A protein has these predicted regions:
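Twin-arginine (Tat) signal peptide motif
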Residues: 1-13, 18-24
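A residue-level marker of the well-folded mature domains of exported/periplasmic proteins
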Residues: 3, 9, 27-267
Length: 267
């Protein structure tokens, strides 16, 4: 089962509209089971947590948990795939009634997610494919995000330029964005990817900046950097600014936050 964030947005608007029609706070008894009683245990098992998007995501989960009287347990693996799988087992041992798996690698989360299902726990996967028909898959329109960014890149730079590309395989949203990048290169044969690099080592932006410095030195003819995750783009910008190339290289990204907009407005 796959649910896009656009559909979730419509559902959220519907819920917000319904809330406005209610007088005061809804009684717990009005909620569907098991939320008709406080203290439902839910675990949020995270793979990625660095950056404004993930901070906002966590704040949203915490706010919703508070509104429903949920006992929320947050387990953060900080990009350690084996640890994230262990944390699913920890959540099972805690006796939670629900688990949200946020990002991760299919190969490490598939079996862990199945163990949770076998234990009778409701599981939802956000931006990670656990290859399980019993688990709802929540995702955004990553291909469209990449397409819009790259259409702008072609509009700004024409259809012939040398590019650096920041990518880490195995992360579902990045893999979907990569599909669009591959398609765009096929459509515009003049676009040449001269360097591909990327890392999720913490701190992500600084780690990517270290890689980007070497890439810029090796490929001074790069005109465009496609970094379709804002922490990647922040790292590229650090390296580009340090090299004094901010006038000659354009950076295209996704997952834009307030701090990203501030960086975009810098001269």
């Amino acid at each position: 089962m796959s649910i896009t964030r656009r559909l979730l947005g419509k559902a959220a608007l519907g819920l917000a509209g319904a809330a406005l029609l209610m007088q005061g706070t809804a009684l717990a008894a009005d909620r569907p089971a098991p939320f008709d009683k406080p203290g439902v245990k839910i675990a949020l098992v995270r793979y990625l947590s660095t950056g404004d998007f993930f901070q906002a995501y966590l704040s949203g989960v915490e706010a919703q948990a508070n509104a429903l009287g949920v006992d929320l347990r947050v387990l953060d693996s900080r990009q350690d795939a084996a640890l994230q799988a262990d944390m699913v087992d920890q959540a099972i041992a805690l006796g939670v009634q629900g688990i949200i798996i946020q990002h991760g690698l299919t190969e490490s989360m598939k079996d862990a997610a199945q163990r949770a299902v076998d234990a009778g726990i409701k599981v939802v996967a956000f931006d990670v494919n656990v290859e399980n028909p019993k688990i709802p898959q929540i995702e955004q329109s990553d291909r469209d995000l990449a397409r819009l960014a790259l259409e702008q890149a072609v509009k700004d730079n024409g259809d012939a330029w040398k590019a650096g590309y920041v990518y880490v395989a195995g992360i579902a949203p990045l893999d979907r964005r990569n599909e669009t990048w591959v398609d765009v290169k096929k459509k515009h044969s003049g676009i040449s990817e001269v360097a591909m690099f990327g890392t999720l080592d913490n701190p992500i932006a600084n780690s990517v900046a270290n890689q980007a410095r070497s890439v810029l030195q090796a490929h001074p003819d790069i005109k465009v950097m496609f970094a379709p995750y804002d922490e990647f783009a922040k790292g590229v910008k650090i390296a580009v600014d340090e090299a004094g190339l901010n006038k000659g290289i354009k950076i295209y990204s996704a997952d834009i936050s307030t701090s990203d907009i501030a960086a975009m407005r810098e001269p």
